[in-house]
Amino acid sequence: MPGCDTGANPLGWTQDAGLIGLPQPVLLHWSPKSPFVRKVVIVLDECGLTSQVERRRTVADRLRPDPAYLQRHPLGTIPMLELDDGSILYDSAVICEYLTIIRPTPALLPRAGRARFDVLRRQALADGMLDAILLWRQERIRPPAQQSTAFHAAYALKARTALDALAAEAAQWPEALDLGQIAAGAALAYLDLRFPDLAWRDGRNGLAGWHDRFEARPSAAANRLVLD
């Protein structure tokens, strides 16, 4: 099975027996509550890199950002990956692309051509839907008197439109897992936990069936969202 593109090791990462590996040590700032973090740890698992990464539980509070963390990551979000040379990688899309380059794996991100950009676009759709959902959740937890009816209507429409687009595509998704599918799986799992009233599965049986199969994968089952 084709692997991720290792290229000519242009960044100088270590190679052993023809495989490009992670520099050591590597630190992932994470939380089991973040769907974007979940996307990264599923990719780590699929790439066989989980044991090479130290995890540090990090709180990324939107209203009370940690000044020390902001010095390393100006946006203060998670996930963030710290490499041994002090380099910092964020956000989840950048981290995932890095992981698919440094370690051969079933081709989560094709090397080139239309197939590559199909996967990147699918990831962008899933991540964009998740960004919208997270903003919508912030509106939902405001005091009822301060909530905007127009905001709710707009973001409900965005969520439904994105879900319909994913549902329309799901039947044509390749059998082999790719990065765009991982992003979609992480976003849909978050909807199950935080937005059960959205009932995204209703009328989208194909997408729902795909998601059930995704969640049964060992990499997904080992990295469930935990909303403590």
Language-model features, listed with the residues they occupy:
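GST-like domain detector, emphasizing the conserved glutathione-binding G-site
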Residues: 2-149
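Short, flexible helix/strand-to-coil boundary loops that buttress conserved ligand/catalytic motifs
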Residues: 41, 93, 134, 195, ...
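Non-transmembrane alpha-helical segments in soluble domains
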Residues: 96, 100, 120-123, 163, ...
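Short, hydrophobic secondary-structure boundary micro-motifs
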Residues: 106-111, 199-201, 221-226
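GST-like fold's C-terminal all-alpha helical module
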Residues: 126-212
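Charged phosphate-binding loop/patch that engages nucleotide di/tri-phosphates or the phosphate backbone
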Residues: 209-223
